[in-house]
């Protein structure tokens, strides 16, 4: 199997948001380790973390799947994640069509506008939802299992897609 890259792009400006990102990153890394153990190669799945304010088009073009994370701010995704899309769209929307994606959105009061925006942006990129997005308000610990499942499912989708390409 060729190396598979899962790109985790997020904006996590608070300890609460950082904790959500850490939960997702740990789950993705654990899933990658399980793949390595079952398939015998520790370098098969790489988890790459990217701050949304520091977009890297080449990194996105090399990704086999993407997990996005943001807070819901004033009814929209974070400006940082919008900046990521603005900075990568022109170069990446055609070459990454069909890319498996999922995301988390955590709001203090409401995530409705951010959910709509995320679906519009990922649809505009022609990405395919690989796992049920985790969109919630309140205490992240109440959604930890969903976050873990989402991350594991995205890793699994990327591995399955890679196996089909063989």
Task: List where the protein language model places each region.
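Short, flexible coil/linker segments at domain boundaries that flank nucleotide/cofactor-interacting
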Residues: 1-3, 96-97
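N-terminal beta1-alpha1 ligand-phosphate binding loop
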Residues: 2-32
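Short histidine/acidic/glycine/proline-rich micro-motifs that form metal-
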Residues: 14-15, 105-110, 136-141
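Residues that form or flank phosphate/diphosphate-binding pockets in enzymes
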Residues: 15-19, 76, 112-113, 142
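Alpha-helix termini
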Residues: 31-41, 92-93, 161-165
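A short beta-strand-loop structural module common to alpha/beta enzyme folds
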Residues: 34-54
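Glycine-rich phosphate/pyrophosphate-binding loop and the adjoining helix
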Residues: 39, 128-166
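Helix-loop-strand module that forms the ligand-binding subsite of alpha/beta enzymes
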Residues: 52-128
């Amino acid at each position: 199997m060729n190396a598979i890259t899962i790109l985790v792009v997020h904006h996590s400006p608070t300890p609460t948001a950082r904790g959500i990102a850490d939960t997702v990153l740990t789950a993705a890394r654990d899933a990658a380790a399980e793949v390595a153990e079952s398939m015998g190669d520790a370098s098969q799945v790489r988890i790459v973390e990217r701050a949304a304010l520091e977009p890297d088009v080449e990194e996105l073009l090399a990704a086999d799947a993407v997990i996005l994370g943001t807070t819901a701010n004033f009814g929209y995704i974070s400006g940082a994640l919008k900046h990521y899309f603005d900075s990568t769209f022109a170069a990446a929307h055609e070459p990454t069509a069909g890319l498996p994606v999922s995301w988390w959105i955590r709001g203090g009061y409401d995530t409705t506008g951010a959910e709509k925006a995320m679906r519009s942006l990922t649809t505009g990129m022609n990405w395919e939802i690989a796992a049920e997005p985790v969109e919630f308000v309140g205490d992240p610990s109440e959604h930890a299992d969903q976050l873990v499942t989402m991350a594991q499912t995205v890793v699994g989708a990327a591995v399955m897609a890679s196996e089909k390409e063989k």
